UniProtKB/Swiss-Prot annotation:
SUPFAM superfamilies, alphabetized: beta-beta-alpha zinc fingers (SSF57667)
Chain ranges for the short sequence motif Nuclear localization signal as given in the UniProt record: 133-140
Species annotation: Arabidopsis thaliana (Mouse-ear cress)
Pfam families: C2CH-3rd_BIRD-IDD (PF22995), C2CH-4th_BIRD-IDD (PF22992), C2H2-2nd_BIRD-IDD (PF22996), zf-C2H2 (PF00096)
Gene responsible for this protein: MGP
Annotated Basic and acidic residues bias: 22-33
Role, per record: Transcription factor that regulates tissue boundaries and asymmetric cell division. Contributes to the sequestration of 'SHORT-ROOT' to the nucleus. Interacts with the SCR and MGP promoters. Does not show transcription activity by itself, but regulates the transcription of downstream genes through interaction with other transcription factors. Binds DNA via its zinc fingers. Recognizes and binds to SCL3 promoter sequence 5'-AGACAA-3' to promote its expression when in complex with RGA. Positively involved in gibberellic acid (GA) signaling.
C2H2-type zinc finger span: 70-92, 111-141, 146-169
Region (SHR-binding): 183-195
Upregulating conditions: Up-regulated by the transcription factor JKD, and down-regulated by SHR, SCR and itself.
Cellular location(s): Nucleus
Protein name, per record: Zinc finger protein MAGPIE
Length: 506
């Protein structure tokens, strides 16, 4: 055995060389742990975990709840404990005996709950003292006899009721809604309900706002008009360019009034035109788009263009009558431009949509074209007379705005043509026999325009709106009907553009 490996234990220490340093340190650490063992905490017995060596006692509910288990045979007074009864017997000069503690250790007792469904009914979960099992049975399974007068809370154990009465009303719990509670459990229950109600109310309010926004967005018009300018809505589909049928090849002239904007880019020019000609359907390109301001200036035109402006192409007068008839029939789909004076004295325009349902008008126009494709000029004039007679059936009945505008435009253009000396060409557009028909029925047409027959037409849209009772009849010429035609519609000679109108629109 070498000196490097030997150890000296006389003094309890170690003498070692450098080669045995690691081994000695490890041994010293183990010895230190053996001298100072770790502290072990003593675990408390949880409620319902009694000593397995304890005596288990099961009492009936009646015996357990009895307040006076020990009775005096002299006076009948009852006591909860036997020791109290023995002391009472001493007052009656009766033999009494108190229990003496012996040196022998007494076996511990535990009590089980008489309720079979209770968790403490099992012996392994029995409670350790008689008072504890009594209070447990009263609180969990007994009747709550004591009631607090302040908060109406009830208790089954009298001691609990007394402890609550001392602190009841001294502390309050206030909810955000303003309700005050003295009991914390009631406050917690109410607060949970109040928070859930607030969240539900916020959700319903958000849903109602979203629904109203959707309804408002859905009620917007397909087209918005601003100062006589047609602006298609970006969120809604645009109507087709031909609401009254396929386009017909014809000459575009100066009397068509497509509603266009003055400032437009190249993309707007390349798009299909969504404007609607006043009397005939057809496409117009960007070279033929004319602003409304340009219509104020006089421009040269031929009488044939005047006929086409009113009736379309003379070769297609059957289709023209169909279009005119559909315009008169569906008067609820055509709204004439109305002018309003604002506070500054300027004139602004409120132009509603020119048509409500394009598909419906197209179908109705096609159906009407089959029925009246061969309608003659006489039938057209009779239809105009019937329309005037219908509008004057009662003294308070007036012609609608759509019919008035249509008749005014019809009479103004026809009278202008007659004054220019083109009456033969005017009636020739209806057919070969239209001139003879007009000359033969001259007296009859004059009777239609007679005010005594009750057929009068308001001469201006402003008078129609502001003074519906004011009607007047304008005769052609200063001589009182001294021309080749008669004012059989009673609208008089009236131009389209007025000095009080804006952009040439009434």
């Amino acid at each position: 055995m070498t000196t490097e490996d030997q150890t000296i234990s006389s003094s309890g220490g170690y003498v070692q060389s450098s080669s045995t340093t690691d081994h000695v340190d490890h041994h010293h650490h183990d010895q230190h742990e053996s001298l100072n063992p770790p502290l072990v905490k003593k675990k408390r017995n949880l409620p319902g975990n009694p000593d397995p060596e304890a005596e288990v006692i099961a009492l009936s509910p009646k015996t357990l709840m009895a307040t006076n288990r020990f009775l005096c045979e002299i006076c009948g007074k009852g006591f909860q404990r036997d020791q109290n009864l023995q002391l009472h017997r001493r007052g009656h000069n009766l033999p009494w005996k108190l229990k003496q503690r012996t040196s022998k250790e007494v076996r511990k007792r535990v009590y089980v709950c008489p309720e079979k469904s209770c968790v403490h009914h099992h012996p392994t979960r029995a409670l350790g003292d008689l008072t504890g099992i009594k209070k447990h049975f009263c609180r969990k399974h007994g009747e709550k006899k004591w009631k607090c007068e302040k908060c109406a809370k009830r208790y089954a154990v009298q001691s609990d009721w007394k402890a609550h009465s001392k602190t009841c009303g001294t502390r309050e719990y206030r909810c955000d809604c303003g309700t005050i509670f003295s009991r914390r459990d009631s406050f917690i229950t109410h607060r949970a309900f109040c928070d859930a109600l607030a969240e539900e109310t916020a959700r319903l309010n958000a849903a109602s706002h979203l629904k109203s926004f959707a309804a408002t967005a859905g009620s917007n018009l397909n087209y918005h008009y601003l100062m006589g300018t047609l602006i298609p809505s970006p969120s809604l589909p645009q109507p087709p360019s031909f609401p009254f049928g396929p386009p017909q090849p014809q000459h575009h002239h100066h009397h068509q009034f497509p509603i266009t904007t003055n400032n437009f880019d190249h993309q707007d020019v390349m798009k299909p035109a969504s404007t609607l000609s006043l009397w005939s359907g057809g496409n117009i390109n960007h070279h033929q788009q004319v602003t409304i301001e340009d219509r104020m200036a006089p421009q040269p035109h031929s009488p044939q263009e005047d006929y086409n402006w009113v009736f379309g192409n003379a070769n297609n007068h059957g289709e023209l009558i169909t279009t005119s008839d559909s315009l008169i029939t569906h008067d609820n789909n055509i709204n004439i431009v109305q002018s309003k004076e604002n506070a500054n004295g300027a004139t602004s325009l409120s132009v509603p949509s020119l048509f409500s349902s394009v598909d419906q008008i197209t179908q109705d126009a096609n159906a009407a074209s089959v029925a009246v494709a061969n309608m003659s000029a006489t039938a057209l004039l009779q239809k105009a007379a019937q329309m005037g007679a219908t509008s004057s059936t009662s003294p308070t009945t007036t012609i609608t705005t759509d019919q008035s505008a249509y008749l005014q435009s019809f009479a103004s253009k026809s009278n202008q043509i007659v004054e220019d000396g083109g009456s033969d060409r005017f009636f020739a557009s209806f057919g070969s026999n239209s001139v003879e028909l007009m000359s033969n029925n001259n007296n009859g047409l004059h009777e239609i325009g007679n005010p005594r027959n009750g057929v009068t037409v308001v001469s201006g849209m402003g008078e129609l709106q502001n003074y519906p009772w004011k009607r007047r009849r304008v005769d052609i010429g200063n001589a009182g009907g001294g021309g080749q035609t008669r004012d059989f519609l009673g609208v008089g000679v009236q131009t389209i553009c007025h000095s009080s109108s804006i952009n040439g629109w009434i």
